[in-house]
């Protein structure tokens, strides 16, 4: 959530920055609400001053033995008007809060301006895509060859956009997740967490998925109890660990990592990536979250991105890093880098990680703060998140980049310890 004071006092400036994201701020309505708020607040303050004066006059009139009934009537009337003023202020604030929940974050000044993914800027590349001397198969053909990837049975069980993995491919999928978690905890300083896969609405509001993106979520209604939602990413549960807290500055940065399934309805993805494991309703992901001092958050974003890149480097998978433009960033991000891995069957790079600095946007929603050691006052932390990595898409990249002419798959060196020393599957 944006700073309400900033939106109220500088709506034109905020609108101009949001316009670079393709978001149209209703400036007229915000200015009208601000005028109403000022008017009601001024009147309320005047009434309170008058009521205080009347109350003081009642005591003085009593001492003089005068009739205080008119003064009491004034005090009662003003009390009713003050209650009405409070109701009006609450209604104005409620409408503003509702508007704020639907407004995306402001892009950082370093973010390239553009309308869509075509304006994203390539920052760097690592590795060279392999040249094959045989016809490249996609991961579906490679996995179905021995029945180790079974989309037909998955569809029978659950419908479209699900996968059933068996045998060596299931083991390879598990090996990837274990490798990622071990790397991030042992070398990158993250604390591993096991989180709930079901969360309540306030957690999703805290990280920005609600109320705007409810159609993307799987919701579980419960009679007489709060609804639960399947997490679309462990970002939700990890970031909300600090919800409502005031942290000691010495605790920062906090760095969490978790391997979880993720659940998404893919409501806006009809017709896209219908074949294979690229876009599914259920997929595993290793998620990294950092809670940091605001002064260090953009430096932390570079480090977070490097942590995700390290996974791809050790797997020797070619990739590139993109700085997302204003029009392609996620709702809560102020700056984002996407990592795209080379997928030979598609002859292009595909997203495998998104690393974002959300500034104080999520922290304000969650009321996650730290105590500034210089002022002693609570201030909002900054939050960051990134995939380290999406396990299913990493599996796709390994299957396709490590395929051999006979359809077998070489096991990447860093995964061999997790595969019992197996060097080739298939």
UniProtKB/Swiss-Prot annotation:
- Which EC number(s) are documented for this chain? 6.1.1.11
- Function according to Swiss-Prot or TrEMBL: Catalyzes the attachment of serine to tRNA(Ser). Is also able to aminoacylate tRNA(Sec) with serine, to form the misacylated tRNA L-seryl-tRNA(Sec), which will be further converted into selenocysteinyl-tRNA(Sec).
* Organism placement in taxonomy: Bacteria, Pseudomonadati, Pseudomonadota, Gammaproteobacteria, Pseudomonadales
Which GO molecular-function terms appear in the entry? Answer: ATP binding; serine-tRNA ligase activity
Name the enzyme group at the top EC level: ligase
Instruction: Provide the protein name.
Output: Serine--tRNA ligase
Instruction: Name the HAMAP family on file.
Output: Ser_tRNA_synth_type1
Which pathway is this protein assigned to?
Answer: Aminoacyl-tRNA biosynthesis; selenocysteinyl-tRNA(Sec) biosynthesis; L-seryl-tRNA(Sec) from L-serine and tRNA(Sec): step 1/1
Question: What are the GO cellular component annotations?
Answer: cytoplasm
- Source organism, top-level taxon: Bacteria
Domains: entry comment: Consists of two distinct domains, a catalytic core and a N-terminal extension that is involved in tRNA binding.
């Amino acid at each position: 959530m944006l700073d309400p004071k900033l939106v109220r006092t500088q709506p034109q400036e905020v609108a101009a920055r949001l316009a670079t994201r393709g978001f149209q701020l209703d400036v007229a309505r915000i200015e009208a609400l601000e005028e109403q708020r000022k008017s009601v607040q001024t009147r309320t303050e005047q009434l309170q001053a008058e009521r205080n004066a009347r109350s003081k006059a009642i005591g003085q009139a009593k001492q003089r033995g005068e009739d205080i009934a008119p003064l009491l009537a004034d005090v009662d009337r003003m009390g009713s008007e003050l209650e009405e003023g409070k109701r009006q202020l609450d209604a104005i604030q409620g409408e503003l809060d509702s508007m704020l929940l639907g407004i995306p974050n402001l892009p950082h000044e370093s973010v390239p301006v553009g309308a869509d993914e075509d304006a994203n800027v390539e920052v760097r590349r690592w590795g060279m895509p392999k040249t094959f001397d045989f016809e490249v198969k996609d991961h579906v053909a490679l996995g179905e060859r021995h029945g180790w990837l079974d989309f037909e049975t998955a569809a029978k069980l659950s419908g479209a956009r699900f996968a059933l993995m068996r045998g060596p491919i299931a083991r390879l999928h598990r090996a990837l997740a274990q490798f990622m978690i071990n790397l991030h905890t042992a070398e990158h300083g993250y604390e591993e967490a096991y989180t709930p896969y079901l969360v309540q609405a306030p957690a999703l509001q805290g990280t920005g998925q609600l109320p705007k993106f409810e159609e993307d979520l799987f919701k579980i209604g419960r009679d007489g109890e709060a609804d639960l939602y399947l997490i679309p990413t462990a970002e939700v549960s990890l970031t909300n660990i600090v919800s409502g807290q005031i942290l000691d500055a010495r605790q920062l940065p906090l760095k969490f990592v978790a391997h979880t399934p993720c659940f998404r309805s893919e409501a806006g993805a009809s017709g896209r990536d219908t074949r294979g494991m690229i876009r599914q309703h259920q997929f595993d992901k290793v998620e990294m979250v950092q809670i940091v001092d605001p002064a260090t958050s953009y430096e932390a974003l570079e480090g977070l991105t490097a942590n995700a890149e390290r996974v791809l480097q050790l797997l020797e998978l070619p990739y590139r890093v993109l700085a997302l433009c204003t029009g392609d960033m996620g709702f809560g991000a102020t700056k984002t880098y996407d990592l795209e891995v080379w997928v030979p069957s598609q002859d292009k790079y595909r997203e495998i990680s998104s690393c974002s600095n959300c500034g104080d946007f999520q922290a304000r929603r969650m009321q996650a703060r730290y105590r500034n050691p210089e002022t002693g006052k609570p201030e909002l932390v900054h939050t960051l998140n990134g995939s380290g990595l999406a396990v299913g898409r990493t599996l796709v990249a390994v299957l396709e980049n490590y395929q051999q002419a006979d359809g077998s798959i070489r096991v990447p060196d860093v995964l061999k310890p997790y595969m019992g020393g197996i060097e080739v599957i298939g």
